[in-house]
């Protein structure tokens, strides 16, 4: 029997889950070659600007396979609508039947993306962070910071954005959560003061120049998830002591790594995959003076893992489907 759950039911069980454990295990399985993930399906729109990603796959010898559809329409804030929406379909790997429809409205995608940022910071952030820099004022610009709490002891933020109204709203909302927030429209102000920087925008041209990066800086770049998007000067990756990809194969054609590769600034063999760092097959940050970059383009194994965890928690909690 197919069960259908809405976002409110999904949120009821999230507090019971160790999502970080599931996501880390997924990345490790992926880097070990135990995950089947076809190329990302996508639709890109111009007027209004937006994109839809279709990500799907399975872990070998697991119980399920998943298909996720997630949309992002970045000007929806102008018409008082969420900038993202979506759902995940979970099927049995044994007989192909649809077991669960998770009407999460992109909530699970946002959670698994924020958790990936937490995992990256755990292995790659400098030991002392006085201020966090954030590029982007919407969902991931907020969630990335909130999900860092278990691994980063810092409550000061400098946030960059294009629209002052959005910056003001971000400042007001995050200060209610206990953060100290400074807003800016000058990227250099962020890079000057922050050694941990998160980029979470749909930009299609670099926001940060290589000359602005200070020794000891870590950047988690997660906004560039299509071949059109770009947030970093490719020379930043050339200068970095360590460049980590959530999926090397996927980052060959999308994200910041693809731009640096196309420019001949880095080589594929210089890249490290996140799952190998988690598993201890590769080292994370080894010095507070290193410049490190993580390119998170979003991998289907994250969707598989979080959908599986939520589905099983909902069954165990005996929450009825809608």
Predicted regions and their residues:
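NAD(P)-binding Rossmann-fold cofactor-contacting core
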Residues: 150-177
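Adenosine-phosphate binding glycine-rich loop
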Residues: 228-322
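Rossmann-like adenosine-cofactor binding region
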Residues: 179-260, 265
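N-terminal Rossmann-fold NAD(P) dinucleotide-binding loop
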Residues: 141-142
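N-terminal ligand-binding/catalytic initiation module
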Residues: 1-110, 116-118, 125-128, 301-304, ...
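Short helix-loop-beta connector
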Residues: 124-131, 153, 214-215
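Glycine-rich Rossmann-fold phosphate-binding loop(s) that bind the pyrophosphate
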Residues: 137-138
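Conserved beta-strand elements of the Class I
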Residues: 132-133, 292
């Amino acid at each position: 029997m197919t069960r259908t759950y809405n976002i409110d039911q999904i949120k009821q069980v999230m507090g019971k889950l160790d999502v970080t454990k599931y996501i880390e295990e997924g990345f490790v399985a992926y880097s070990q070659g135990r995950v089947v993930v076809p190329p990302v399906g996508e639709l890109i729109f111009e007027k209004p600007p937006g994109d839809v990603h279709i990500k799907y796959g399975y872990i070998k010898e697991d119980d399920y396979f998943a298909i996720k559809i997630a949309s992002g329409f970045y000007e929806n804030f102008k018409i008082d609508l969420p900038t993202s929406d979506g759902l995940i379909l979970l099927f049995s790997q044994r007989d192909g039947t649809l077991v669960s429809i998770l009407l999460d409205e992109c909530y699970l995608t946002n959670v698994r993306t924020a958790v990936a940022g937490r995992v990256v910071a755990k292995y790659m952030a400098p030991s002392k962070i006085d201020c966090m820099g954030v590029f982007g004022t919407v969902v991931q610009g907020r969630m990335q910071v909130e999900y860092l709490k278990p691994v980063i002891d810092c409550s000061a933020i400098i946030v960059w954005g294009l629209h002052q109204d959005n910056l003001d709203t971000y400042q007001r909302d995050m200060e209610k959560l206990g953060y100290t927030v400074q807003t800016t429209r000058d990227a250099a102000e962020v890079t000057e003061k922050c050694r941990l920087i998160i980029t979470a925008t749909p930009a299609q041209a670099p926001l940060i120049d290589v000359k602005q990066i200070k020794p000891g800086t870590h950047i988690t770049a997660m906004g560039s998830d299509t071949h059109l998007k770009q947030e970093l000067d490719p020379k930043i990756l050339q200068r970095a002591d360590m460049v980590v990809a959530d999926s090397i194969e996927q980052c060959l054609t999308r994200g910041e790594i693809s731009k640096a590769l196309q420019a001949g600034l880095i080589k594929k063999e210089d890249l490290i995959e996140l799952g190998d760092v988690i598993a201890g097959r590769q080292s994370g940050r080894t010095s507070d003076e290193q410049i490190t970059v993580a390119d998170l383009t979003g991998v289907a194994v994250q969707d598989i893992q979080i959908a599986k965890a939520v589905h099983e928690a909902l069954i165990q909690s005996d929450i009825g489907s809608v």
